[in-house]
């Protein structure tokens, strides 16, 4: 028997019923469903809707169900329609008619919204912890790189010299934005929907403010119609996950390229690579490639969910059942991808000579133009002169390091005797002046700030930093 069988003369068609069953995946909400029901029973008792003995029996029954489910996941099984039906069935089996009173004044429409909010509230911090661990790995690599140099790239063409540490901290910076996006999604879940009923509210004098405090919510939803269909918090979570996966995909792409033989700036650890069944020499970046591939999966969950939401009329619709599979899959995808990325990044070896060699040559052209500009030449004119120098050097198979002082001065009388010494990768990074630049002092300050940010998380989330590892 279903929770809604009273209206119907016949049993549901098995195919139609099975099509709507969600217990196969929403059992993940077991703990949240029981937690919400415990609070609801308490609220019903507090306003006199439940007799004290019934409230006590329900509480005892739900606590025993929760204990059994935590002890043995196989306990959470059956032919039930959804997790709500399962919990109610188990409760009635244990406490009889008192269990049939639990759903007084409550709809599954608000119940499932509550469950999913509770679920995300406890699961988002775990994803944030994994993000912080990866950020820590990048900070550790930045510290280990010290003042090593590498080329930066635009259009996948060498652009300007940067510190390797600056490159690592660039990825840490993007991941910190992902941490904040997930925090924004967590804040968005922080509203109690109970008291909304199916759509119009409940006729029982439930103290929703007290109920919100009991469940750890900072506020109650504003409108019962909106609450019954609101899954904006799901979209926000999926967006946060998708952006994190986009950044992980870009990280993966960078290291797939930079660990390849043609670049060789970094070496993958044997423990975070795979081989070939045919080619003995191969060392493949499979974990990185899978992270890159799974980003499309997460993005698909976001776009699919937005497409589901876009045409729904006001109030609850069964389409909203699709939210849970999107959430669960996106969460698993990000969690596993963060674990894999951490395994790779934390074990990377810098091949400093290869990286430094690639950071010299013609990518110093901007610094040469800046040299002229600092000495009074308009930048656009300096750009033209240096461009002509580059054209000549390419034709001759040379770079700036091969120019004699005479050749420098022939290119422009703005070049002084110090021009050859100024056109080096090390001078290039020291010439930068802004706080977000690759200047070594700026990078060291950025690393300290990143460490401070990570340390600030520890009291709340137990996120490890280098001191505790």
Model regions: which residues?
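Short, well-ordered beta-strand elements within core beta-sheets of diverse protein domains
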Residues: 42-50, 119, 166, 235-243, ...
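Short linear loop/turn motifs
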Residues: 57-60, 225-230, 385-389, 424-427
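Charged, flexible cofactor/metal-binding loops and thiol motifs
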Residues: 116-124, 129, 143, 151, ...
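Charged/polar low-complexity intrinsically disordered segments
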Residues: 460-464
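Glycine-rich cofactor/substrate-binding loops
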Residues: 1-32, 36, 97-98, 264, ...
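Helix N-cap/coil-helix junction residues
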Residues: 49-50, 217, 377, 398
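Generic, well-ordered alpha-helical scaffold segments in large soluble proteins
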Residues: 40, 61-68, 90, 94, ...
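A helix-coil-helix interface module used to build multimeric assemblies
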Residues: 1-201, 206-208, 274-275, 290, ...
């Amino acid at each position: 028997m279903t929770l809604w069988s009273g209206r119907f003369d016949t049993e549901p068609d098995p195919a139609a019923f099975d099509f709507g069953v969600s217990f196969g995946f929403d059992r993940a909400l077991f703990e949240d469903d029981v937690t919400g029901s415990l609070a609801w029973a308490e609220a019903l008792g507090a306003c006199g809707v439940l007799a004290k003995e019934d409230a006590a029996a329900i509480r005892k029954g739900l606590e025993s169900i929760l204990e059994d489910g935590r002890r043995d996941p196989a306990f959470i099984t059956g032919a039930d329609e959804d997790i709500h039906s399962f919990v109610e069935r188990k409760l009635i089996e244990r406490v009889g008619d008192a269990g049939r009173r639990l759903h007084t004044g409550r709809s599954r429409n608000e119940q499932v919204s509550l469950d999913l909010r509770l679920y995300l509230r406890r699961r988002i911090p775990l994803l944030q912890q994994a993000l912080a661990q990866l950020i820590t790995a990048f900070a550790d690599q930045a510290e280990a790189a010290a003042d090593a140099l590498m080329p930066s790239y635009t259009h996948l063409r060498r652009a300007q010299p940067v510190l390797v540490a600056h490159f690592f901290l660039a990825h840490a910076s993007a991941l910190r934005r992902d941490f904040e996006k997930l925090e924004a999604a967590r804040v968005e879940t922080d509203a109690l929907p109970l008291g909304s009923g199916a759509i119009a509210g409940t006729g029982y004098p439930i103290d929703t403010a007290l109920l919100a405090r009991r469940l750890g919510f900072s506020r109650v939803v504003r409108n019962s119609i909106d609450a019954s269909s609101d899954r904006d918090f799901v979209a926000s979570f999926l967006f946060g996950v998708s952006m994190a996966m986009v950044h992980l995909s870009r990280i993966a792409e960078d290291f797939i390229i930079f660990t390849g033989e043609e670049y060789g700036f970094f070496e993958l650890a044997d423990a975070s690579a795979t081989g070939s069944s045919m080619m003995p020499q191969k060392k493949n970046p499979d974990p990185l490639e899978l992270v890159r591939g799974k980003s499309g999966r997460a993005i698909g969950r976001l776009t699919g969910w937005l497409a589901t939401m876009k045409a729904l009329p006001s109030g609850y619709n069964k389409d909203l059942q699709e939210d849970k599979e999107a959430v669960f899959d996106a969460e698993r995808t990000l969690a596993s991808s963060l674990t894999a990325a951490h395994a790779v990044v934390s074990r990377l070896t810098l091949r400093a000579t290869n990286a430094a060699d690639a950071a010299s040559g013609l990518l110093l052209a901007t610094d040469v133009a800046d040299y002229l500009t600092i000495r009074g030449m308009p930048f656009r004119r300096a750009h033209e002169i240096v461009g002509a120098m580059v054209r000549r050097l390419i034709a001759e198979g040379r770079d700036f390091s091969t120019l004699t002082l005479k050749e420098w001065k022939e290119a422009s009388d703005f070049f002084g005797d110090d021009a050859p010494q100024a056109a080096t990768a090390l001078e290039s990074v020291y010439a930068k002046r802004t706080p977000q630049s690759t200047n070594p002092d700026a990078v060291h300050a950025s690393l300290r700030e990143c460490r401070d940010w990570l340390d600030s998380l520890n009291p709340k989330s137990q996120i490890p930093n280098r001191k505790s590892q």
